Amino acid sequence: RMDTDGKYTEVMIRWLDCIRDGKNPLIFGDGSTTMDFVYVRDIAKANVAALQADVTDESFNIGNCEETSLKQLLEVLLKVNDSTLTPEHREENSINPVSRRLADISKAKKLLDFTPTVTLEQGMKELTKWYFEKIKITAN
């Protein structure tokens, strides 16, 4: 699981905090930057497959094979939280100039028989549930 309180807290946690607080989530730029999001359970599944496979000294890309823009990601997160908040756009920063990311998992499919199983929406539902349970526990 990701660090929810650190300096480099992921955007999804920041957005969940906005949803919890009823504040419009921030998107820097137009939200067109894409990433390949993969749920932690699929990462664990890939690690177990690598441990059990008859391969050594190999590295693998693991992803969901789906390019998702930050705008789309926020739309899914708002949907699974039944939120009507709208994003607030700010000027894009230049911290991360890579505009598109998509994992090529063909090697993992071939050598590990790995295929991701958790959809983006399912992963966002599980992240939301986990995070709100976590902050409830730490608040007590």
Task: Pin down the residues of each PLM region.
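Hydrophobic aliphatic residues
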Residues: 19-20, 77, 81
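Amphipathic terminal alpha-helices
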Residues: 120-140
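Residues that recognize and position ribonucleotide moieties
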Residues: 36, 66, 101
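Generic structural signal for alpha-helix termini and adjacent loop/cap motifs
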Residues: 18-22, 50-54, 111, 130-137
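Conserved C-terminal active-site "lid" loop/helix of NAD(P)H-dependent oxidoreductases
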Residues: 40, 59, 71, 93-115, ...
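Glycine/proline-rich active-site loop of Rossmann-fold NAD(P)-dependent oxidoreductases
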Residues: 1-13, 23-24, 28, 32, ...
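Hydrophobic "lid"/C-terminal helical patch
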Residues: 47-51, 74-77, 124-131
